[in-house]
């Protein structure tokens, strides 16, 4: 069994270099919520050195709140902003002799696109128009995945090791109790359930089905590095191969 393990990087965390030795895919911030040209270049070089698949991590323009502010923007604006960010990272990757593999939206852009078909359509169109061979990563079972499929993009359905789920398969908003899983054992058990059994237990106790093609571990988490090591060990023990 294979699984992709991804992390959001280039967001100002000291553990980026070490995480790149543990994950198979890196989602690199493109400057709208975090990062800048130099951090993008540094992350790209480190990812290439470690053989890690590189992806753009576009966001709403929200550096003040790390891309977590809800916004109502015209789809054309979201299309342009997404294209701009993908293009910026793509230029750096190309200049370093690499190939960009995927796009995964960040924060509130990701969450809103999971439920808003118009927003999802704008993002999927931007990815397709930039490079139709790129993989679009989105929340498992979301509108973003459906939009990607409509544009005939290869999609990857994502699950989260350290986030709480609602009964409909969506993430618990960060403003609500149960949004983040701080207990390492619970996060590990949830991840293995999603990957091996295709199910997740919601905060209300209801089990729901989920398709896990890639697992996200947050690079900005306090224990991200230690948890990544534990997760890799758990996968190895169960003959689950981490591969992009």
Curated annotation (Swiss-Prot):
Keyword Hydrolase found: yes
Protein name: 5-oxoprolinase subunit A
Claim: ATP-binding is one of the keywords in the record: yes
Keywords annotated in UniProt: ATP-binding, Hydrolase, Nucleotide-binding
Underlying gene: pxpA
Family indicated by similarity: Belongs to the LamB/PxpA family.
Catalysed reactions, as listed in the record: 5-oxo-L-proline + ATP + 2 H2O = L-glutamate + ADP + phosphate + H(+)
Group of enzyme by EC: hydrolase
UniProt function note: Catalyzes the cleavage of 5-oxoproline to form L-glutamate coupled to the hydrolysis of ATP to ADP and inorganic phosphate.
UniProt-listed GO biological process terms: carbohydrate metabolic process
NCBIfam families xrefs: PRK05406.1-1, PRK05406.1-3, PRK05406.1-4, PRK05406.1-5
Cystine bridges: none
Subunit (UniProt): Forms a complex composed of PxpA, PxpB and PxpC.
EC number: 3.5.2.9
Organism expressing this protein natively: Salmonella agona (strain SL483)
One MF annotation (Gene Ontology) recorded for this entry: ATP binding
């Amino acid at each position: 069994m294979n699984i992709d393990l991804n992390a959001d990087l280039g967001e100002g965390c000291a553990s980026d270099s070490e995480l790149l030795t543990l994950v198979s895919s890196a989602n690199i911030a493109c400057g709208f919520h975090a990062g800048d040209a130099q951090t993008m270049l540094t992350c790209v070089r480190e990812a290439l050195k470690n053989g890690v698949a590189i992806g753009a991590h576009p966001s709403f323009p929200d550096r003040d709140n790390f891309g977590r502010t809800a916004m109502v923007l015209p789809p054309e604006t979201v299309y342009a902003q997404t294209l701009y960010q993908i293009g910026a990272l793509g230029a750096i990757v190309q200049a370093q002799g690499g190939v960009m593999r995927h796009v995964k939206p960040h924060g509130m852009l990701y969450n809103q696109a999971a439920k808003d078909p118009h927003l999802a359509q704008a993002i999927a169109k931007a990815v397709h128009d930039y490079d139709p061979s790129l993989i679009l990563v989105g929340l498992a079972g979301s509108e973003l995945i459906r939009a990607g499929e409509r544009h005939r993009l290869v999609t990857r359905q994502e699950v989260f090791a350290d986030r709480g789920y609602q009964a409909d398969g969506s993430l618990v908003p960060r403003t609500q109790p149960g949004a983040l899983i701080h207990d390492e054992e619970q996060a590990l058990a949830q991840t293995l359930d999603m990957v091996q059994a295709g199910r997740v237990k919601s905060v209300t106790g209801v089990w729901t089905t989920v398709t896990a093609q890639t697992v996200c571990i947050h690079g900005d988490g306090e224990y991200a590095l230690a948890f990544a090591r534990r997760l890799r060990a758990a996968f190895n023990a169960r003959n689950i191969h981490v591969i992009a």
